[in-house]
């Protein structure tokens, strides 16, 4: 977003989620900006960089992709920053599901087809409550947007069909659609 670009341009410190963030986003940074790839950092290390920057009066940007309210894993960071009395602001980007719809030129809600969008994910390292399992959600026959699920495609297909979708149901698998 334009707001995100402005924040990156004035940051003294940027901590970005390495494999998830397009490196082109970092091109607007100041030459003297310290940049950290968090892909190989623990939460404690990330927080340590933030705390040190705050103590030095520096502006830090913790760069995630998309909308951090969807599988953004920011709760722990927010809680820790509050405990350290470090003020923060959240600047959401465009969620992958919105960018994907635009890139594919499709609409998730169509009259007579679906007026509901279910956003979820398959169970992986993080479990999903049984009431939110793919077969349970598929029973609604609504449009489904599934994050973090490409590593489970055979199981996912089986569960979607078990829930009521047919093998002819349109589907798209998208990676870095925007």
Predicted regions and their residues:
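Beta-strand/loop-alpha-helix module characteristic of Rossmann-like adenine-cofactor folds
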Residues: 6, 60, 87-89, 95-178
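Class I S-adenosyl-L-methionine
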Residues: 2-94, 99
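Residue-level preference for alpha-helix termini and adjacent loops
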Residues: 1, 19, 24, 69-70, ...
């Amino acid at each position: 977003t334009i707001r995100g670009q402005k924040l990156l341009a004035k940051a003294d410190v940027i901590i970005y989620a390495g494999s998830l963030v397009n490196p082109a986003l970092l091109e607007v940074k100041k030459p003297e900006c310290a940049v950290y790839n968090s892909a190989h950092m623990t939460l404690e290390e990330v927080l340590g960089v933030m705390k040190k920057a705050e103590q030095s009066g520096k502006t830090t940007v913790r760069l995630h992709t998309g909308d951090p309210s969807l599988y953004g894993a920011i709760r722990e960071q927010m809680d820790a920053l509050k405990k350290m009395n470090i003020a923060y602001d959240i600047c959401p980007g465009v969620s992958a599901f919105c960018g994907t719809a635009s890139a594919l030129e499709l609409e998730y809600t169509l009259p007579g087809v679906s007026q509901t969008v279910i956003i979820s994910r398959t169970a992986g390292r993080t479990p999903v409550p049984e009431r939110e399992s793919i077969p349970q959600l598929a029973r609604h026959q609504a449009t489904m947007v599934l994050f973090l699920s490409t590593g489970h495609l055979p199981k996912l297909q089986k569960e979607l069909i078990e829930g009521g979708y047919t093998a002819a149901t349109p589907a798209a698998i998208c990676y870095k659609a925007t």
